[in-house]
Amino acid sequence: MKQMSYVTRWLYSTSHKDIGMTYLGFGMLSAMMGTGMSVMMRMELSNGNSQFFHGNNQAFNVMMSGHALLMMFFFIMPVWMGAFGNFFLPMLMGAADMAFARLNNISFWCLPPALVCMVCSVLMEQGAGTGFTTYPPLSSMSAHSGPSVDLAMFAMHLTSMSSLLGAMNFMVTVLNMRTMGLHMVNMPLFAWAMFLTAMLLLLSLPVLTAAVTLLLMDRNFNTGFYEVGAGGDPVTYEHLFWFFGHPEVYILMMPGFGVMSHMVSTYSKKPMFGEMGMLYAMGSIGFLGFLVWSHHMFVVGLDIDSRAYFTSATMVIAVPTGIKIFSWLATIYGGELRLGVPMLFALGFLFLFTMGGLTGVMTSNASMDVAFHDRIFIYYVSFFLYTLYNMYNNYTNNNTAHKGRHCANASYNNDINNLVSFMDKNEYIKMFWVGLMDGDGSMQVNHWRKKNLQYRLIMKTSNLESNYNMLMLMAKVMGGTVRISKKKDNVMWVVDSKESIKDMMKMFDKYPLLTSRKMCQINFMKKCMKLNYMPAEGGYPREAGTDWYLLNRNYKYNDQLNMINTFNLKLKNKSFMNALPEGHGMHHMVKHSEYFKCWLSGFMEAEGCFSIRLNKSNSFSMGQNDDFYLMEEIKQFFNATNSVRNSYKNFYCLEIYKRIMLNNIITHCSNYPLLGEKKESLMKFLK
């Protein structure tokens, strides 16, 4: 098959990720244009006299109209819905792509001609200086007789078509493309936000299209829908425009609500507080958004009953909005807060969104609007920009990878770069590797003809593609080589370089092994290396290491047995943690809980087992020889009520089957991901 060219890939792409990136690039181009117009307005207003337009007020109005339309229809909507929605929604749903891949491509290619029309409307003749609302009679032939307003209307038609096609695609994807076992109520909040936004688009955009079409007919076909002299009414246009215009505010904000929830949950390391409440709040905001449009029209001559209704309905929206704000604050409260750059933006958004909402209290009051008339635009712009601009900062500084329980089965399709956002990727892999070494690893010291000692670190797993990829990731960070055994039944990670092993010994001091057997192995190896490679420091002859090895190689686990026996005696009279042997790695684990969580994921990859029983119930089990105290600590970490049982000789097993405790395990694996075969087992387990 002929390889697709670079140009063909981007022009004819049906990949949701490629299309998402084209949306992003298009949005950035539009943002630069809109920002340029904003700079021109700022320069003009920087001094009391005319600075830039030399008294040409029409040019200023054209810049303001172009800026608003570009930023809303060509920047915010394509970037938030098109780019982030297309890129992340299929992954969150566990789907291979969007439901209608070619329709997805068409919805994007409606935008470039729309942008051309929009730019031409600014540049041709006197420009479209109508404001972004394009109210008649200011937008009628009597005020703007050139083609500029017509081109702006065509641009809005094309963007509406693009958004409608995208909205249908999003809704069908959410309804029909969810992975097995992912019910609607268990979807991530970002997926719900995109679904509700698509519903708002589908219900509101046809009304805008109708209003704009009637305006075009008035301008070009001599109709009189909005012409007072012909029996029409310009207020009709206002009702139609704002029936779209107010849901449009929530169309622009709703995806940010979903992202904000994921961001706060991730950087607080807690599940979202009141997740169902957040879902109902978003639904309520979307529903109420269709019932309050005339609060933009308080001074056009509404009767007092209508003004009273729209004032009351507008204030009711504050209730679900307050629920969302307090749920975000409750999630942050008591969490392990990490103030990364995205979280700083999230905290800034919380403050600015609250301030912007307070301006909405003033603009919702019909009585105050009469006094604020001619100044209401200032309040409206402050409300609009406080909320949207800072939510966009939030959006662009978040990686959107949700760490919650409900999207674990879908987000596991992402790689380690997306999943581990709260720490350095390499550090996570190192801590994960230590846990994997505790379970599947081996530290070997051998001799060659009783003269030279040879050292090796080996990790052996079953020969599966997922395990091979995991060990290749380990080798990339830790060094070493990955090879497949002669019988093709195992894949191994091996390090036999003395210098590399010395470096790893230092890393084990930072991230200690926690199982008794591996602790004894590393102590034995360190002793041999000290005697063999550091004779000058220790005052030992070079052959001392080999002699000591030959003398003690058959007794290297005696320390482990003594450690366990001592621990069991102490446990009768002391608390669990106080009974631990002196210097044991569990003391480090308590001091560095973040390390233990990462280590535990590696240990679960090696020793854990996700099972589906014959009665269709789920369970998780893991065990370890001799290390009762370690299994007891893991039990306490997951808040498990099951006892650690001695199933065979000194093999201690922990089995968890209650749903609440299983949820704790799933949440842990979402935050600290498994990387190999157990990752696939967990995905099947969730289905």
Swiss-Prot record:
UniProt GO cellular component terms: membrane; mitochondrion
Modification after translation is described as: The mature protein may arise from proteolytic cleavage of an in-frame translation of COX1 exons 1 to 3 plus intron 3, containing the aI3 open reading frame.
Query: PROSITE patterns, per this entry?
Result: COX1 (PS50855), COX1_CUB (PS00077)
Pfam families noted in UniProt: COX1, LAGLIDADG_1
SUPFAM superfamilies, from UniProt? Answer: Cytochrome c oxidase subunit I-like, Homing endonucleases
Which residue ranges run through the membrane? 19-39, 69-89, 103-123, 152-172, 188-208, 240-260, 273-293, 315-335, 341-361, 376-396
Q: Which GO terms describe its biological process?
A: electron transport coupled proton transport; intron homing; mitochondrial electron transport, cytochrome c to oxygen
Entry-linked InterPro entries: Cyt_c_oxase-like_su1_dom, Cyt_c_oxase-like_su1_sf, Cyt_C_Oxase_1, Cyt_c_Oxase_su1_BS, Homing_endonucl, LAGLIDADG_dom
Q: Which UniProt keywords apply?
A: Endonuclease, Hydrolase, Intron homing, Membrane, Mitochondrion, Nuclease, Transmembrane, Transmembrane helix
Q: What class of enzyme is it?
A: hydrolase
Q: Does Mitochondrion appear among the keywords?
A: yes
Q: Where in the cell is it found?
A: Mitochondrion; Membrane
Spans annotated as COX1 intron 3 encoded: 375-687
Using the UniProt annotation, give all residue ranges assigned to the region (COX1 exons 1 to 3 encoded). Answer: 1-374
The way it spans or sits in the membrane comes to: Multi-pass membrane protein
Q: Which GO terms describe its molecular function?
A: cytochrome-c oxidase activity; endonuclease activity; heme binding
Grouped into one coarse class, the protein's main location is: mitochondrion
EC number(s) on file:
3.1.-.-
The UniProt similarity line reads: In the C-terminal section; belongs to the LAGLIDADG endonuclease family. In the N-terminal section; belongs to the heme-copper respiratory oxidase family.
The record's function comment reads:
Mitochondrial DNA endonuclease involved in intron homing.
Q: What is this protein called?
A: Probable intron-encoded endonuclease aI3
Name the gene: aI3
